[in-house]
């Protein structure tokens, strides 16, 4: 494609177009050295302006894709944070399972085992709520 443009355009137009192609859009729009030329440079300005408009159109076409990628990343991050809630459920089950086993082994320690079980339940539940809060922050605050 570059070879076809090389045959159909003047060398100055090719240089201006390639300069626009490798510069960021903000730099191409804000600081155009081609805009200050007159006379013969008007073809260069038109070529650069066409290149800028093509880059701007390309940016608008990819912005929807980048928004979709950002949305997918949000959902993946929120799903990964929600896995912590399942871990909290498993932790609560382990705490109360250990309470039952400990009570079956030594019933005289019922009160002390129960207080430790409540402490373990609270810590596990706090981690689950923290994971859920992070998931909601990822979804709705970012």
UniProtKB/Swiss-Prot annotation:
It comes from the Eukaryota. Residues 1-67 form a transit peptide. GO terms for molecular function: lipid binding; proton transmembrane transporter activity. Its main location: mitochondrion. Coiled coil: none annotated. It is found in: Mitochondrion membrane. The record marks 125 as: Reversibly protonated during proton transport. Trimethylated by ATPSCKMT at Lys-110. Methylation is required for proper incorporation of the C subunit into the ATP synthase complex and mitochondrial respiration. InterPro entries: ATP_synth_F0_csu, ATP_synth_F0_csu_DDCD_BS, ATP_synth_F0_csu_sf, ATPase_proteolipid_c-like_dom, F/V-ATP_Csub_sf. The modification N6,N6,N6-trimethyllysine is found at residue 110. One of its GO terms (biological process) is proton motive force-driven ATP synthesis. It is a multi-pass membrane protein. The chain crosses the membrane at residues 83-103, 118-138. GO terms for cellular component: mitochondrial inner membrane; mitochondrion; proton-transporting ATP synthase complex; proton-transporting two-sector ATPase complex, proton-transporting domain. Keywords: CF(0), Disease variant, Dystonia, Hereditary spastic paraplegia, Hydrogen ion transport, Ion transport, Lipid-binding, Membrane, Methylation, Mitochondrion, Neurodegeneration, Transit peptide, Transmembrane, Transmembrane helix, Transport. Changing residue 106 to K: In DYTSPG; likely pathogenic. Mitochondrial membrane ATP synthase (F(1)F(0) ATP synthase or Complex V) produces ATP from ADP in the presence of a proton gradient across the membrane which is generated by electron transport complexes of the respiratory chain. F-type ATPases consist of two structural domains, F(1) - containing the extramembraneous catalytic core and F(0) - containing the membrane proton channel, linked together by a central stalk and a peripheral stalk. During catalysis, ATP synthesis in the catalytic domain of F(1) is coupled via a rotary mechanism of the central stalk subunits to proton translocation. Belongs to the ATPase C chain family. There are three genes which encode the mitochondrial ATP synthase proteolipid and they specify precursors with different import sequences but identical mature proteins. Is the major protein stored in the storage bodies of animals or humans affected with ceroid lipofuscinosis (Batten disease). HAMAP family: ATP_synth_c_bact (MF_01396). It is linked to Dystonia, early-onset, and/or spastic paraplegia: An autosomal dominant, highly penetrant movement disorder characterized by spastic paraplegia and/or dystonia to varying degrees in affected individuals. Cognition is not affected. There is high intra- and interfamilial variability in phenotype and age of onset. Some patients have onset of progressive focal or generalized dystonia in the first decade, whereas others develop progressive spastic paraplegia as adults. Some affected individuals have manifestations of both disorders. F-type ATPases have 2 components, CF(1) - the catalytic core - and CF(0) - the membrane proton channel. CF(1) has five subunits: alpha(3), beta(3), gamma(1), delta(1), epsilon(1). CF(0) has three main subunits: a, b and c. Interacts with TMEM70 and TMEM242. This is ATP synthase F(0) complex subunit C3, mitochondrial. The gene is ATP5MC3.
């Amino acid at each position: 494609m570059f070879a076809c443009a090389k045959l159909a355009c003047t060398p100055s137009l090719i240089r201006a177009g390639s300069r626009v192609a490798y510069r960021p859009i903000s730099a191409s729009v804000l600081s155009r050295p081609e805009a200050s030329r007159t006379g013969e440079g008007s073809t260069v300005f038109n070529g650069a302006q066409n290149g800028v408009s093509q880059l701007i159109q390309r940016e608008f076409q990819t912005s929807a894709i980048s928004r979709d990628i950002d949305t997918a990343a949000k959902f993946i991050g929120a799903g990964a944070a929600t896995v912590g809630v399942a871990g909290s459920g498993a932790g609560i089950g382990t705490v109360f399972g250990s309470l039952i086993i400990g009570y079956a082994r030594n019933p005289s320690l019922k009160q002390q085992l129960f207080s430790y079980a409540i402490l373990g339940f609270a810590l596990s539940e706090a981690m689950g709520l923290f994971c859920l809060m992070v998931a909601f922050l990822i979804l709705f605050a970012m």
